[in-house]
């Protein structure tokens, strides 16, 4: 690995109200970049890796230093351009333009493969930004906890009469994304057994209370699960092992979980999925010396993993892909029926997307947890009738450990995002919170992604692969005045399989911020309603009508009906 990708340095975002940059609009991206590399947040901060295999915040340490310098100098009418983690230009724009525009990992379609990307990465010409790593709005595992919780709750409604009490979830992966699974299962009322091949990840999840217990052996794990489900307790158990070994063994034993999924980093066979029989150190070494052979070995293990998932599905166990592209990897290794079980979005989440509901998140730049608790109360006050959301916020406060700057996520839609943003901005203006708040979201949202094996799988009109939508989302957020906007490729499912956009907006308490918030936090979720209405989803059309969206072709179609 080039020296510039490794530095023994501890980075933490500044706290409080003293500015390093020239305004809060440039201080915010600076703090969030640093927060992504906080050792309590990032998986491997010394190599700039935030989460998801090799999802980085900056291309190398020289680029990181240059980004920090540029942000501290940036004027109120300038925009910094980031190309795959490298600051390439500062241009005069205007005070309502984004302060930062980011493009990460984008390749011309024919060349959008891991092989070509890895060549560019080795030459220092590219950076994998994942979704929120390179767009500087990662908040640790909390960022996916509620989405996973909502998925498990909906699965309980569909398959088990509305409750997961006395049930258990079998899954794997305790990295930045997968680490949310055991806590989400517990919050949804279920037990869980999560397989993870790195002891350090299990230790971190135990320390932060995302996992309750670790079992010493598979027999021990199953005994614990049997006891807890019989007692009706929701307890999460981790086992240090390889999922490609454990899932087939469970099938052979005739063990029957109640839900099966997976969140290993299968999207990246070179860095994210340990081949069966290998040690992690051996995997890292071979990734450098024999990348092709390493990828093939990882994908062979994924094939065994997916065959076991297919076997569970054939038993009648609800089984679903949680968006890591493991089915595609298995299919490439000859598992022709890999897609016989669905992805989580078409199975459980799409009705939410039709209403523009998705992972709305915010961060207290002050570093004071009390600011988040005050915003929690404000959300309850504004979204007064949503008791399910209130329950989530109560559980989040009780169980979720803040990583880095205090943050919160809650899934809300078009109807509420603008109202919440304006309320937060007013809290900053009147001093109810001690410093500005940034509002962002995952790129996994209703109108910001094209990913045929994940968010846009099995679209009603067959438009799964059409990536005009995330491009339009990024353009509209730029025109609307988001503080920073990002457009990435390959997040979640790997090179060649997705394109997606993100936005972040700062609530600094000013009237100008309020005007930007009105535009951005309406237009951003509205693109999700638009995208699904255009695809023919009645729920999205109804939402568009209720919210007064101007969708010419949808209106014309409705008129003909």
UniProtKB/Swiss-Prot annotation:
Its cofactor is NAD(+). Gene3D superfamilies: Urocanase like domains, Urocanase superfamily. Keywords: Cytoplasm, Histidine metabolism, Lyase, NAD. The active site is at residue 410. NAD(+) binds at residues 52-53, 130, 176-178, 196, 201, 242-243, 263-267, 273-274, 322, 492. One of its GO terms (biological process) is L-histidine catabolic process to glutamate and formate. GO terms for molecular function: urocanate hydratase activity. Pathway: Amino-acid degradation; L-histidine degradation into L-glutamate; N-formimidoyl-L-glutamate from L-histidine: step 2/3. One of its GO terms (cellular component) is cytoplasm. Pfam families: Urocanase (PF01175), Urocanase_C (PF17392), Urocanase_N (PF17391). Binds 1 NAD(+) per subunit. It is an enzyme of class 4 (lyase). Catalyzes the conversion of urocanate to 4-imidazolone-5-propionate. Belongs to the urocanase family. This is Urocanate hydratase. It comes from Salmonella gallinarum (strain 287/91 / NCTC 13346). The gene is hutU.
């Amino acid at each position: 690995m080039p020296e510039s990708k490794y530095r023994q340095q501890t980075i933490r975002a500044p706290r409080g109200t003293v500015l390093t940059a020239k305004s809060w609009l440039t201080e915010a991206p600076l703090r969030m970049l640093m927060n992504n590399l906080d050792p309590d947040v990032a998986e491997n901060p010394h190599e700039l890796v935030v989460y998801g295999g090799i999802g980085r915040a900056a291309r190398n340490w020289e680029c990181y230093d240059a980004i920090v310098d540029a942000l501290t100098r940036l004027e109120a009418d300038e925009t910094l351009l980031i190309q795959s983690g490298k600051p390439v230009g500062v241009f005069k724009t205007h005070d309502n333009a984004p302060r930062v525009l980011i493009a990460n990992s984008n390749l011309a379609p024919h060349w959008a493969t891991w092989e070509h990307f890895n060549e560019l990465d080795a030459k220092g010409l590219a950076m994998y930004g994942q979704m929120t790593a390179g767009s500087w709005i990662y908040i640790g595992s909390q960022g996916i906890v509620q989405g996973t919780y909502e998925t498990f709750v909906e699965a309980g409604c569909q398959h088990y009469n509305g409750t997961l009490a006395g049930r258990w979830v079998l899954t794997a992966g305790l990295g930045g994304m997968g680490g949310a699974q055991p806590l989400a299962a517990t919050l949804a009322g279920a037990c869980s057994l999560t397989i993870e091949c790195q002891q350090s990840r299990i230790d971190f999840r135990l320390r932060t209370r995302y996992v309750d217990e670790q079992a010493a052996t598979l027999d021990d794990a199953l005994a614990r699960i049997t006891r807890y489900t019989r007692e009706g307790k929701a307890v999460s158990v981790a086992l240090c092992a390889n999922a490609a070994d454990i899932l087939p063994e469970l099938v052979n034993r005739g063990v029957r979980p109640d839900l099966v999924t997976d969140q290993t980093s299968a999207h990246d066979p070179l860095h994210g999925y340990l081949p069966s029989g290998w040690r992690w150190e051996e995997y890292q070494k071979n990734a450098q010396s024999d990348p092709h052979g390493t990828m093939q070995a990882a994908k062979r293990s994924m094939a065994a993993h997916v065959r076991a998932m297919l076997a569970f599905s054939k038993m009648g166990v609800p089984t679903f892909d949680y968006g890591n592209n493991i089915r595609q990897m298995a299919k490439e290794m000859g598992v022709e029926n890999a897609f016989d079980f669905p992805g989580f979005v078409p199975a459980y989440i799409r009705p939410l997307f039709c209403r523009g509901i998705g992972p709305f998140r915010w961060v207290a730049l002050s570093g004071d947890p009390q600011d988040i608790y005050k915003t929690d109360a404000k959300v309850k006050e504004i979204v007064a009738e949503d008791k399910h959301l209130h329950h989530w916020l109560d559980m989040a406060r009780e169980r979720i450990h803040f990583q880095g700057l205090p943050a919160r996520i809650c899934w809300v839609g078009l109807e509420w995002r603008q109202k919440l943003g304006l309320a937060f901005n007013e809290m900053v203006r009147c001093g109810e919170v001690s410093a500005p708040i940034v509002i962002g979201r995952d790129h996994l949202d209703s109108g910001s992604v094209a990913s045929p094996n994940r968010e846009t799988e099995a679209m009603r009109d067959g438009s799964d692969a059409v990536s005009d939508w995330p491009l339009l989302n990024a353009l509209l957020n730029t025109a609307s005045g988001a503080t920073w906007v990002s457009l990435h490729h390959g997040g979640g499912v790997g090179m060649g399989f997705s394109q997606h956009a993100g936005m972040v907006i700062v609530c600094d308490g000013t009237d100008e911020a309020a005007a930007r918030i009105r535009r951005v936090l309406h237009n951003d979720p509205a693109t999700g309603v638009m995208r699904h209405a255009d695809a023919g989803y009645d729920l999205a059309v109804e939402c568009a009508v209720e919210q007064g969206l101007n969708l010419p072709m949808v209106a014309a179609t409705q008129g003909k009906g």
